[in-house]
Amino acid sequence: MTIQWCGTGLSAIPGLRRLIEAGHDVAVWNRSTDKAETAVGDLTDRINAFDKDALAEVLKPGDVVVSMLPGDWHVPLAELCLSKDAHFVSSSYIAPEMRALDATARDKGLCLVNEIGLDPGIDHLMAHHLVAEYRASGAFDPANDLSFTSYCGGVPKVPNPFRYKFSWSPLGVLKALRSPSRSIRDFSELNVARPWDALSSYDAPLPTPETFEVYPNRDSIPFIADYRFDPDWRIKDFVRGTLRLNGWSEAWKDIFAEIETLEGAAGDARLKEMSDQFWQEHAYDEGEADRVVLCVDLKAEQAGQPVWHKTYVMDAWGDARGTAMARLVSIPVSLAIESVLNREIPAGVTPAPHDPKLLARYLGEVGHLAQHLQVVDHLT
């Protein structure tokens, strides 16, 4: 069984190297073989120019295809896997087109695993851990009012006036600023057209407490079921969101104002111009330390008083091992690949696992990747 790893971009390398160093049978595919050789040429000579047809020729039943390529490749590669009786893993959100492959994958006994990077990925693991711990606690009561928040962000380790730096093309970040979000605030559905319309402050329970700016991201509501909340639980707040350094909204206010005016093809062209400019002005320098902060919080209240309240908090930054972002995206992917090979993940289209044994193993590994990882109990 061969791991067919496609894509050797910035966020892919630590997980790929981990698998090769562990002795797994790994073939590497990348559009630029030179870049792949720079990344892993010291460990392997099994490097191929990425081509879907060439991959199809060598793909065998039981192999695992890993897509660390741009998102539009995930579904075509997953479909190829189904046709060849192979498994598939990516770190990306499950698109409707991917979800549509679930029944076929189940019928064939094949795993199509997604959402197992950082966010989505590690955040899911933390959420599953907290929900399971709450269920097992003496404070559990279906009548409690529950508040769930999950905030993640990549930020510069050393803050800059722009309050942000880019690890790769800024276009994705800029496009996300044009995306609506859906969450629950104070028992009501909150629909927001632009992130800056729902900015709030968040006090992260780090060893040295720190305040960040946060805003809802995408559609949080489907994750209520994904995180195994019972349908009859009373949900006061449920937000999955993005975290930024304090002062970010002030530093970006002119960008927000311009994005508000952009429309159609001309707007897309201007967004690309802005992306190119920001890449010139605000990209990480070679060797510069990045930082990732992730806080997943679950609180249960009775009559307005907290009866259970814990936060899973992580703080990680770039070091001699490379960037925090690359470690935290790609190593969970590598763990999921091993779980697929070990038949520990059910067939079908699935996000990050919720099995307690896998949670313990994966989060244990995250503890080695991050400089700080802790479950904070606010009531002790």
What are these regions (language model features)?
Residues 3-8:
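Conserved N-terminal Rossmann-fold NAD(P)-binding element of oxidoreductases
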Residues 11-12:
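Hydrophobic/small residue at the entry helix of a nucleotide-binding pocket
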Residues 26-39:
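NAD(P)-binding Rossmann-fold cofactor-contacting core
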Residues 41-54:
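Rossmann-fold cofactor-recognition segment
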Residues 63-68, 89-90:
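N-terminal Rossmann-like NAD(P) cofactor-binding module of classical short-chain dehydrogenase/reductase
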Residues 80-98:
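ADP-ribose/adenylate-binding Rossmann-like module
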Residues 92-112:
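Rossmann-fold NAD(P)-binding glycine/threonine-rich loop
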Residues 133-380:
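C-terminal catalytic/substrate-binding lobe primarily of soluble NAD(P)-dependent oxidoreductases
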